[in-house]
Regions:
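Short glycine-rich substrate-engagement loop in P-loop NTPases that contacts/grips substrate
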Residues: 19-51
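Conserved P-loop NTPase "ATPase switch" module shared by AAA+ and STAND
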Residues: 48-66
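Structural recognition of the conserved hydrophobic beta-strand(s) that form the central parallel beta-sheet
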Residues: 81-87, 116
Length: 406
């Protein structure tokens, strides 16, 4: 936000509620910007130009009064640009009332533009690594095979991305230092930070159950049938005791939930199977360290048993940043499953994810041949091409799958 502010405004006025908890007292008892801004100016030691500057409120989850004041900044001081950010806002904006979970009454609905920040995508990563190659990447349309030289170069960057993932601090370290050991240490620290955040909220939440669910994601994915099983958490575990823990992790954007479908039909949301789902981690860099995957296994494209699920997590992460609705999967029996199903326009699109180490039997080809959907996608290490009834799209082009279908 500071970088964005410096590039687009005359001056950035940055306030961090976590670093300076006393800032919260400025927002107590008033929501009036004309009373709040002079006090912030004293703290900052500089005048805030309401027409030229930007006000940045970081870690706003630590100050509910500041969050609620955003409505009044919008109404009473519309000429001032205000940006706010916080971790775990998805859960901190919710509170229990009468057994229900609802947003606070004073939450500025309709007054604030909410942006969910996804991890850095492969496309964004490539832009920072090789801007010239990125421009070529962004020009790709249709499904004609790419020249081998570009295919190999893009695959090399994809392999590096798998080791780094998309967490901004980790990506920034990789770009500035290029030290794999430092990258791994930051990823390990983030995993620990996730767990520390969960423990911090113990009492308001059942931290023990949330940690059990979070730590079960990798072993549950590693099963031949990766559907989430409550019984795998601990002996006698039932859904009723852990549903809230899963909802907390999803709202906190620590895990991604992919629901099963009872039919591959548009609209997908009408065919959710609510009690059948898989859980993935939010970022593949964190999945790498939690699963204990060595960087060289990814860079050298080695086969290993968990690789198929790891690459699925990568694909999901790239798809989740696209604005076309939730990603699903389809499984009718243990031997009939399609990795993902996405909604593209008014089409339900089956998706197969293939990695070099993935030897699972697939129902994808049988479904495509029998149902003949308008679009069908296979993400793999092979070059871009129309392959019979489906389009083969290389894994590095997942963020641009829509352009490849044109």
């Amino acid at each position: 936000m500071e970088n964005f502010g410096r590039e687009n405004f005359a001056k950035v006025h940055f306030f961090d509620f976590a670093a300076t908890p006393d800032l919260a007292t400025i927002f107590e008892g008033t929501k009036n910007p004309d009373e709040i801004l002079p006090k912030l100016e004293i703290v900052a030691g500089s005048k805030i130009d309401r027409k030229k500057d930007v006000l940045v409120l970081d870690e706003i989850q630590d100050c509910g009064d500041a969050l609620n004041s955003l409505k009044y900044f919008y109404e009473k001081c519309p000429e001032l640009a205000v940006m706010a950010a916080g971790s775990l806002l998805g859960v901190n904006l919710k509170k229990k009332k009468g057994g229900r979970i609802e947003p606070p009454k004073t939450y500025p609905v309709g007054k604030v533009e909410i942006v969910d920040v996804e991890p850095v995508s492969f496309s964004e990563f490539l832009h920072e690594k090789d801007n010239v190659l990125w421009e070529y990447y962004m020009s790709i349309r249709g499904n004609d095979p790419l020249p081998d030289i570009f295919h190999r170069r893009l695959w090399d960057f994809y392999s590096i991305y798998l080791t780094v993932g998309g967490m901004p601090e980790v990506v920034a370290s990789h770009l500035s230092e290029g030290d794999p050991a430092r990258v791994r240490k930051l990823q390990q620290d983030l995993v620990q930070l996730y767990e520390n955040d969960i423990v911090k909220y113990n009492g308001e939440i059942d931290a023990a159950k949330i940690l059990v669910v979070l730590r079960s994601v990798v072993p549950q994915l590693a099963k031949e049938n990766s559907k989430f099983m409550y019984g795998a958490l601990r002996e006698g575990a039932r859904g009723r005791g852990y549903e809230e823990a899963i909802e907390w992790l999803v709202s906190a954007r620590m895990v991604r939930r992919v629901r099963n479908l009872d039919a591959i039909e548009y609209p997908l949301s009408a065919h959710d199977v609510r009690n059948a789902f898989k859980l993935y981690l939010n970022d593949i860099g964190m999945l790498k360290v939690v699963a204990g995957i060595a960087d060289e296994s990814l860079v050298l494209d080695r086969d290993f048993p968990f690789k198929g699920r790891f690459v699925e997590n990568y694909v999901l992460q790239q798809l989740a940043g696209k604005a076309f609705g939730a990603v699903h999967y389809w499984a009718e029996r243990s031997d009939r499953e399609i990795d993902f199903v996405i909604q593209y326009g008014d089409n339900a699109v089956p998706v197969e994810v293939k990695s070099g180490g993935d030897k699972r039997a697939s129902s994808f080809k049988g479904y495509v041949n029998s149902k003949k959907p308008k679009f069908a996608i296979r993400f793999s290490e092979r070059n871009l091409k129309k392959d019979g009834a489906f389009v083969n799209i290389p894994l590095y082009l997942v963020p641009r799958f829509a352009e490849c279908l044109q």
